[in-house]
Amino acid sequence: MRELFIETQEKEPEIKIPLPRVGITNLRTIAKINWKGRVYTFIPTFEITIDLPREKKGIHMSRLVESITDAMSEAIEEEVKKIHTSLEELALAVIQRLEEKHRHKRAEVWIRTTLILEKMTPASNKLSYEPYDVEVGVIKEGDKIKKTLKVKVIGNTACPHAMANNEGKTHIQRAIGELEVTTDFNEYVTLEDMIEVVESSFSSPTYTLLKTPDENSVVRRMYENPKFVEDVAREILIKAKKKFPGKIHVKVVSNESIHKHDVIAEAWA
């Protein structure tokens, strides 16, 4: 005999107020993405939310988890080439599975992970694997689908003010540049292109691997290309506006080497 369960979530709440975002966060799992013919494996962190109407006490949390699991199970090795070709396509696949399991008007899926890219060192031309924090979000409301892509890139800056007033000597510091692009789902925007826009805007990029000639090259480049954090933010913004459609947000933080505080520059377009 089939056991009957009480659907507490379907009951009316004492306080009848609609909630625009209810769901799960900090869920870690595995994902496989086929990007330009290569299969990448990620251990991403998911956040998935839907709207909750005023007459419902709660949402069915397990159905949200099932939607992620179903989308993951499709991406077996022999089939991954046919489906998830980007993190945003994976996020949309989760929403599509959720539509089969749970009624809602609005759904969001956010995926945070680390993207590892191959770079060549500037002088010795050796291979270096560089990590970048990235986040992708897909929001579906009715027939409208938007996506947001975010990248966080580490570079460095050399202070032009100290250089101008100290016979060419200056202080340098690590800087963190963030770029966020929000646009229609079908617009072509890649995380790799966004990373390149940010990384090329610093005094110099940073590298995981540096041999002595590479270290010398990075130092020379910094001193030949001094920039305020404001310069970096403006350069990222103008490059991003030319390259990417949609709304753009730029944030740069300089971890100051001669101060006890940091410096920030931020802009929107």
UniProtKB/Swiss-Prot annotation:
Protein keywords: Hydrolase, Iron, Metal-binding
| Pfam families recorded | GCHY-1
According to its UniProt entry, this protein's organism is Pyrococcus horikoshii (strain ATCC 700860 / DSM 12428 / JCM 9974 / NBRC 100139 / OT-3)
**HAMAP family linked to this entry:** GTP_cyclohydrol_A (MF_01527_A)
**What pathway is it annotated to?**
Cofactor biosynthesis; 5,6,7,8-tetrahydromethanopterin biosynthesis
Would I find Nucleotide-binding among this entry's keywords?
no
Q: Which family does it belong to?
A: Belongs to the GTP cyclohydrolase IV family.
* Molecular functions (GO terms): GTP cyclohydrolase I activity; GTP cyclohydrolase IV activity; iron ion binding
Q: How is the cofactor bound?
A: Binds 1 Fe(2+) ion per subunit.
The protein's site described by May be catalytically important is found at: 159
Q: Which domain of life is it from?
A: Archaea
Record GO biological process: tetrahydromethanopterin biosynthetic process
Protein purpose: Converts GTP to 7,8-dihydro-D-neopterin 2',3'-cyclic phosphate, the first intermediate in the biosynthesis of coenzyme methanopterin.
Quaternary structure per UniProt?
Homodimer.
| Enzyme Commission number | 3.5.4.39
Per its UniProt record, the required cofactor names are: Fe(2+)
Could you identify this protein by its name? GTP cyclohydrolase MptA
Which top EC class is named for this enzyme in its record? Answer: hydrolase
Keyword Metal-binding part of the UniProt annotation? yes
Catalytic reactions on record: GTP + H2O = 7,8-dihydroneopterin 2',3'-cyclic phosphate + formate + diphosphate + H(+)
